[in-house]
């Protein structure tokens, strides 16, 4: 099985452990990231997500398909970027309400999955779009990627 996919058993276990509340997502298409190494803004973008949730406690993860995690925190305390393994950002949380913030370098899609970037050959303008199918949202931002973990979303786009 592709490592980014979760099994039915994993989804059932996480449904019993996590209740997702909200996501604040900033998609930065500008190519300007303060205090970070340069990257190719025609191929990649920076995604920053703050996920708010409650948990019964224990090890858990957010799903994210990204080139790499730039920074992550749990309730304001740093998480190691080494916790990002097989498209999952792992963390351990006690029972209660929590907040994970993760910034990542994500890759534009050329297939319509995740965030698609297209340069129109007629007007030479850049267009971005997404359908954010459940399984493809994780290509643009960190989330608890399964349909039964519903939450509200607030998006900010920097272009």
Predicted segments with their positions:
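Acidic/His-enriched low-complexity segments
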Residues: 1-159
């Amino acid at each position: 099985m592709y490592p980014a996919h979760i099994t039915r058993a994993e989804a059932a276990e996480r449904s019993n452990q996590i209740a997702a509340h909200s996501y604040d997502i900033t998609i930065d298409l500008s190519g300007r990231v303060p205090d970070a190494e340069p990257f190719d803004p025609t191929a990649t973008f920076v995604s920053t997500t703050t996920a708010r949730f409650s948990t019964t406690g224990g090890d858990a993860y957010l799903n994210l398909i990204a080139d790499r995690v730039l920074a992550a925190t749990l309730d304001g305390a740093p998480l190691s970027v080494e916790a990002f393994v097989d498209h999952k950002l792992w963390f351990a949380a006690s029972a209660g309400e929590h907040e994970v913030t993760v910034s990542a370098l994500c890759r534009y899609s050329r297939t319509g999955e995740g965030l698609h970037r297209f340069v129109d050959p007629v007007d030479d303008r850049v267009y971005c779009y997404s359908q954010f199918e459940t399984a493809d949202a994780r290509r643009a931002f960190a989330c608890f990627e399964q349909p039964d973990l519903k939450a509200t979303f607030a998006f900010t786009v920097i272009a």
